Amino acid sequence: MKDVKLVIIGCLLFFIGHLLSWFQNNSQFVWDWWKERPLFTVLLFSVPTSLTFWYGMRYAYHGMGDKLWSARFLGFAASYVTFPLLTYLFLGENLFKTKTLLCIALSFCIVGIQIFWK
């Protein structure tokens, strides 16, 4: 049995986690200030990022009927939505390439299969 409310909360937490993770890893390429501050970056981002993934997995796991693989695929698909958008917005890398768009579409398919397939 699936609890849609828990799945939505889990997905939102996965999106936030991937957003934080993107900034933790890629701020060095966007802003010069971050280039020489790896330890500060890790200390600043690691705890909130880890907590959002931890709670995201918890909510998604229970929301997907205690299925770990289903929760894992939701987290994976969330990364393929956040990464291309943030990379386009902050680094100007083209989001509208066939390969990237297909990966994003496949991510939505994965989420749909996990949520709606009985």
Briefly describe each language-model feature range.
Residues M1-K118:
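Polytopic alpha-helical membrane proteins, predominantly small-molecule transporters/carriers
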